[in-house]
A protein has these predicted regions:
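Glycine-rich, acidic loop segments that terminate in or are immediately followed by a histidine
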Residues: 502-613
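N-terminal small/polar loop signature for handling phosphorylated ligands or for N-terminal nucleophile
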Residues: 144-146, 253, 267-345, 352-355
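Flexible glycine/proline-rich, aromatic-decorated loop/lid segments
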Residues: 345-346, 350-365, 560-574
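Short beta-alpha connecting loops at secondary-structure transitions
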Residues: 52, 142-143, 362-371, 383, ...
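An N-terminal, well-structured beta->alpha segment
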Residues: 199-246, 254-255, 263, 267
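Gly-rich Lys/Arg/Thr-decorated short loops/hinges at beta-loop-alpha junctions or inter-strand turns
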Residues: 206-217, 276-286, 505
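Single-stranded RNA-binding regions, centering on S1/OB-family and related RNA-binding modules
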Residues: 1-117, 122, 126-130, 139-150, ...
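A structured phosphate/pyrophosphate-recognition subdomain
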Residues: 239-246, 250-252, 354-510, 527, ...
Length: 613
């Protein structure tokens, strides 16, 4: 005989519909309203029935909880209910009978009701529904939930929660979307099981393919484990809908490195599903004026990231630094970012400082494996990009050659990358593209110029437009360089140092055009190139200086500019000295009133360096 303890009362979950209701069973409901012929009872937000006045057994008011038995479900969907008075019973939740599917399988479920389990990657409130971005082991999908226009649906659901979504697969604006009936947070063993399943699957999915570098190189072979690690981190960020900020030095080498990675990441974002324009708000490439991550850079990036986190419910970003990020000059920015637990990976060829790695989760640098700055950031970035998404290889394999000539690499890898694309791009063509990049980026300032840069690098497929654009940019750049050189070269001062090095000095503040192309750094480089040709086979050092800075270029003198700058910082009190760069190419900053003292101390150090015989 059944006792009250054995009586089961069913509670319909939010996503349940009429197909989940059974005649004869008792359900927990809520009084919705009254009519002359009875009382309307809601079993959930979607289902209601009528308790005829002859079947009512107690007095009620709106929103009272009641127990009702389903007497009949009519062909038209109306439900006849009968009130039940039971003091002791057990409540059992009824979940909607929906098949749990992977996000990757949703295109085959159009028009059907499904269940999806995954992690909340983004919560965006629109003027209409709330859009939840859900990530599972197979992909990313938007879920629309609507209460009323502009009102946050399911406020209890937060970022990074593991949830179960029940809803119908629909097409909205030619884009797949789940229109939710119910979203519930999983907890306990169910949450752990789903999170573990997703983590394990994503970890395997993020593993890069086993591929070799484009060219034969001991340095690149030795760097492959770290490049694979960095590529895996980036791939996992894409698969979990984590925003990515890519910062790079604003020269040809840095641009080539960053654009190679950009092509790989953007194409991977598009392949992973989600919004059709996800590559624009989940990925941002930004040039840095200095060859290190300045306070100005981290301030801008943090400002954007925090606003996007608050306004659009995005995760905090993964930051990729390329052609910068390896030196002590980057440390103040890393310290600020660490307050917000922002992860960093670095792909750089500047001489690294040991204190930096504690801030990074991945660091590709040729110095770590016995290489040097001749293996440029553009070469490294392209190899990492191939690991991120091998399908972009044919589009980007010319970028290392451009980066190598643009950064004046003398490493054997430069010639190998040039040989790789010689049938399409001559060495002169690569030099022209590198110059065009430098020239165009000067006018772009802090803008990435995504589409213009793609045309300069011939990534769009319009060869005729690429050729016309590069020719125009090179013509403009060379004209301005010649104007600058005609103004500068007569004012170069020469000295012969005790070690036999030929030192040349040019005050670019008073003997060069300001606020135009080429800027002081490139002006100093162009002066240096001309002086090297005039002094073929001799050790040459060029310093282009202004009121509070100096730019160094060297050939045949064994200097270590970062170390020299650190030593001068300690040896010249009141100099306010900072700077760095590569071993033989770099810059130094100081206070204006100490310029002469600092420059003489710098020249003394250069004179103590050994020279190439």
């Amino acid at each position: 005989m059944q006792t009250d303890d054995d009586i089961i009362v069913y509670r319909l979950a939010a996503g349940c519909d009429l197909s989940d209701v059974e005649e004869g069973k008792i359900y927990l409901g809520k009084v919705q309203g009254f009519a002359t012929f009875g009382m309307f009872v809601q079993l959930n937000d979607r289902i209601k029935g009528l308790v005829h006045k002859t079947s009512m057994k107690a007095e009620h008011k709106e929103k009272d909880s009641v127990l009702v038995r389903v007497r009949q479900i009519r062909p038209n969907g109306n439900i006849d209910l009968e009130e039940q008075l039971i003091k002791i019973y057990q409540v059992q939740q009824v979940e909607r009978m929906s098949t749990t599917v992977r996000i990757a399988d949703l295109p085959t479920k159009l028009g059907k009701s499904v269940a999806v389990e995954g992690e909340v990657a983004q919560i965006k409130q629109t003027s209409g529904p709330t859009i939840f971005t859900i990530v599972d082991e197979s992909g990313t999908q938007n879920v629309a939930a609507f209460v009323e226009a502009g009102v946050r649906a399911y406020p209890e659901i937060e970022l990074n929660m593991i949830v179960k979504v029940i809803g119908e697969v629909m097409m909205r604006n030619n884009q797949l979307q789940i229109e939710s009936d119910a979203i519930s947070a999983l907890s306990g063993d169910a949450e752990v099981a789903v999170r573990t399943r997703i983590e394990q699957a994503l970890d395997a999915r993020a593993e890069p393919e086993q591929i070799k570098p484009l060219v034969k190189s001991e340095v690149l072979d030795a760097l492959m484990p770290e490049m694979r690690k960095v590529a895996k981190i980036i791939r996992k960020a894409v698969f979990t809908a984590q925003p990515i900020i890519l910062r790079h030095h604003a020269d040809a080498d840095g641009i080539c490195s960053a654009v190679a990675i950009e092509q790989a990441v953007v194409s991977l974002i598009r392949e992973s599903g989600g919004d059709f324009d996800a590559d624009y708000f989940l990925f941002k490439r930004a040039p840095s004026k200095a060859p290190f991550y300045e306070i100005e850079d981290i301030t801008r990036d943090l400002d954007f990231a925090l606003k996007d986190h608050v306004r659009f419910g995005q995760k905090m970003p993964l930051v990729i630094l390329t052609d910068n990020g390896s030196t002590e000059e980057d440390e103040p920015s890393y310290k600020i970012a660490s307050v917000y637990d922002i992860p960093f990976v670095v792909i750089d060829h500047h001489h690294p400082d040991a204190t930096i790695d504690k801030y990074l989760i991945g660091h590709v640098n040729p110095y770590h494996v016995g290489g040097d700055f001749g293996v440029t950031a553009g070469m490294l970035g392209t190899e990492v990009a191939r690991l991120i998404n091998p399908s972009v290889e044919q589009h980007i394999k010319h970028l290392p050659a451009i980066a190598g000539v643009g950064d004046r690499s003398e490493a054997p890898e430069r010639a190998l990358y040039l040989d790789l694309v010689r049938d399409q791009y001559s060495e002169q063509a690569c030099k022209d593209i590198a110059l065009a990049l430098d020239y165009e980026q000067f006018w772009l300032r802090f803008n990435d110029g995504r589409e213009i840069v793609k045309d300069v690098l011939n990534l769009v497929g319009n060869k005729e437009r690429h050729t016309k654009l590069v020719n125009l940019l090179v013509e403009g750049a060379n004209t301005m360089i010649e104007d600058q050189m005609s103004a500068c070269m007569p004012h170069v001062v020469s000295r012969t140092l005790p070690n036999g090095a030929h030192l040349f000095l040019i005050d670019v503040e008073i003997h060069a055009h300001k606020f135009t192309f080429p800027p002081p750094g490139k002006t100093s480089g162009e002066v240096h190139d001309r002086l090297c040709k005039q002094n073929e086979g001799k050790p040459v050092v060029t310093i282009g200086f202004g009121p509070d800075f100096g730019v160094l270029r060297s050939r045949g003198v064994h200097m270590n500019i970062p170390r020299m700058v650190r030593e001068l910082h300690n040896e010249v009190p009141g100099g306010g000295i900072s700077g760095g760069g590569h071993l033989v190419v770099g810059s130094i900053k100081f206070v204006e009133g100490m310029r002469d003292v600092v420059l003489e101390a710098l020249i003394k150090k250069i004179s103590e360096a050994s020279v190439q015989q």
